[in-house]
Structures are given as C-alpha cells and as structure tokens.
Amino acid sequence: MRRVIPVPEDPAAVGLASETVHQTPIFTLEPEPEGASLRIEALVSAAFGPGRLAKTAERLREGNQILPQLSAVARVEGEIVGTVRVWPIRIGAARSTFLGPIAVDPACRCLRIGEALVRFVCETAEAKGLSVLLVGDPPYFGRFGFVQAPKAILPGPVNPGRVLIWMPQGQCDVPAGAVQKGW
C-alpha cells in the first residue's frame, strides 16, 4: 500500500501561500517501516510531550502489538512527517481497534496529512469490518464519522466525552463494555 496525495489545487483553501506550493511536494502514505521507531517517537513526543505516557490510552498500547495493516506513516521528500498507529483491542466481547497516537510534523500540518491518515485508518478498518476507538477531540474526529462511545469503559480515568468510536457501514450495534488490549 502506497498512496500518493497531491498538493491541493487551491492552496489558499488550506492556508498555503501560492509561493509555498511550489516548494511543497506531495506526500505519500505507506506502512510503518522497520527501524522508524525513533523518528515516530520524536513526532509523537513533539505533539504530546512526556505526559502522554501517564495517560489511560497508553495502557492500551503497553505490551500490545501495532496492527501493521492499519498503521502508516506519511512522507514528504522521503522524510517521515506523520504517523498513525492502530492497536488491537476488545470492547466487551467485540474485536475492535484503537487509534493513537496520530502525529504530524508541525511544519507539514497545513498539508492535511492528519486528515489523510485518519481516512486511511477508517477505509482500511471498513474493509476488515472493524470499528475504531480513540480518545480525541469530538469536533475534529466527528468530521470522519466518529461519535461518542459512552458504553466503552477504558482501563483508567478519561474524559468520557472524548472517547469516540467509528463504525463500519452496516454495523449498527455499538460495542459496549470494558476495553482491553489485544484480541
């Protein structure tokens, strides 16, 4: 899987000056490569800081293995500038996935790389019939179809209004119960 995403035709629509567009190449999405952990960790640390390790979401990642078919990086001119990692979880008895972290280099945020990464995860999860759970900003993630998941019980304190779920088309029953890592 390698997707090439062109620079927007209307640079002003995404906050780019026209002279910036000539210097801004397209970006690609591809599977997370082996050996990229240091760069990915640097992106995530810059986005969330060291306090992220104390958050409830981290409990779902510790000792869990990423799902490589749903996790990806974004590259501009060969450099990793964005990342999304997805993990196997259960919500009650239902298999699901947990999205996070997602991080983009601040210099590249105007390219809508984060949006492309979220859409990639949702499209790939759709093909596998899997829901996607995350802890995040409802207005931002609501654009992609994420809704509150009031019956998903995470393994620690979290603002329940920020626990969101995306469901594949045709799947009407929102999973409920304790959220546990792994399948």
Model-identified regions with their sequence ranges:
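Conserved N-terminal entry element of GNAT/NAT acetyltransferase domains
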Residues: 1-35
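Active-site rim helix/loop that mediates acceptor-substrate recognition in acyltransferases
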Residues: 37, 45-85
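Hydrophobic pocket/interface hotspot
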Residues: 40, 44, 141
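Short loop segments at secondary-structure junctions
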Residues: 76-78, 107, 167-171
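A conserved beta-turn-beta hairpin within the catalytic core of GNAT-like acetyltransferases
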Residues: 89-99, 109
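Conserved acetyl-CoA-binding loop-helix of GNAT-fold acetyltransferases
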Residues: 99, 104, 110-123, 134
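Conserved active-site alpha-helix within GNAT-family acetyltransferase domains
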Residues: 126-160
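C-terminal "cap" of GNAT-fold acetyltransferases
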Residues: 155-183
